[in-house]
């Protein structure tokens, strides 16, 4: 029986080719060699070869959908050998990652898949010395029929390009980003959890990997994607979480980088988050640094409050990340007749709120059971999952998982 990649780290005997038969070479061909067919028509099947556990990513007819596995062979690997009922939100090494490079003044091209593993990087790299790096996060879901859904990947591509401009970095085009995501997901298809068991978390990275000693943009950049099957982000699952309002530390400042997904934003919240978790809280809710009375966001997700069926969330003004799940929830809520306000939300409004919830790629929509502010604890509902937040959670997750019709045209299906 084939060893799980969780134990081995990654498989070194995978090959990528554009034919239906195994070849004698194990070189990973560049993406440019596969441009004669779309990445969404790739599938992994067992390759008859004297080398055990050889797989190829093979071309599928454009005129029909691709089955989850090849019907012409019985020796296939549909799912990785892990306990899908016990996965959490943690890294589980998969088979492939995707990499693409360019110079500071150049363009990204010739990306390729390679076995998942460590990367070589110069100790003088811009990302290590000056934090010149961005990341994104999105998910792939397996449908009941075996097809795979991505959720608004072009939005992540656009957000990365906006962040790259702020950080003086070149960025892949939207088309390059989306095709790279498709290619990486399909190459790791067996790691996508069964329906209802979780999702495949996709982590695109953009880093200044060229060596630079003085403070300046790096001379070379790497775009990389790796993936991991995940369960719920919070240990509580979809149960209510408990937040504490942070009054000493701040996540972002006006004119800073709080509105882009740069890596430094997340290192900066670890101290306050660690203190909060040591006290038994799930996470931290930050206030603005000027007045210390307006809600901003949680460490890694946006915040919403509900009062009398009116939904309010802090407006995007440079210090808050423009979350894609946030944007989607707002659009879903408005399509269902809810009034949604994007405005300054004061911390005092937490006292009277009927419901509070967080949104983000990792958490999707997480109900807030309580918020503690200056030693006062405010609770929301009997179980924290209010009527409005439950309705929005169900609507969004049903759409993401392919359980309801996508009238928004947000999902991208891979066969």
UniProtKB/Swiss-Prot annotation:
InterPro entries: Aminotrans_IV (IPR001544), Aminotrans_IV_CS (IPR018300), Aminotransferase-like (IPR036038), B_amino_transII (IPR005786), BCAT-like_C (IPR043132), BCAT-like_N (IPR043131), BCAT_family (IPR033939). The keyword Plastid applies. Keywords: Amino-acid biosynthesis, Aminotransferase, Branched-chain amino acid biosynthesis, Chloroplast, Plastid, Pyridoxal phosphate, Transferase, Transit peptide. GO terms for molecular function: L-isoleucine-2-oxoglutarate transaminase activity; L-leucine-2-oxoglutarate transaminase activity; L-valine-2-oxoglutarate transaminase activity. One of its GO terms (cellular component) is chloroplast. It is found in: Plastid, Chloroplast. GO terms for biological process: isoleucine biosynthetic process; L-leucine biosynthetic process; L-valine biosynthetic process. The modification N6-(pyridoxal phosphate)lysine is found at residue 261. Its cofactor is pyridoxal 5'-phosphate. It comes from the Eukaryota. It catalyses: L-leucine + 2-oxoglutarate = 4-methyl-2-oxopentanoate + L-glutamate; L-isoleucine + 2-oxoglutarate = (S)-3-methyl-2-oxopentanoate + L-glutamate; L-valine + 2-oxoglutarate = 3-methyl-2-oxobutanoate + L-glutamate. Its EC number is 2.6.1.42. Residues 1-65 form a transit peptide. Pathway: Amino-acid biosynthesis; L-isoleucine biosynthesis; L-isoleucine from 2-oxobutanoate: step 4/4; Amino-acid biosynthesis; L-leucine biosynthesis; L-leucine from 3-methyl-2-oxobutanoate: step 4/4; Amino-acid biosynthesis; L-valine biosynthesis; L-valine from pyruvate: step 4/4. CDD domains: BCAT_beta_family. Belongs to the class-IV pyridoxal-phosphate-dependent aminotransferase family. Converts 2-oxo acids to branched-chain amino acids. Acts on leucine, isoleucine and valine. Branched-chain amino acids are synthesized in chloroplasts, whereas the degradation takes place in mitochondria. PANTHER family: AMINO ACID AMINOTRANSFERASE, BRANCHED-CHAIN-AMINO-ACID AMINOTRANSFERASE 3, CHLOROPLASTIC-RELATED. This is Branched-chain-amino-acid aminotransferase 5, chloroplastic.
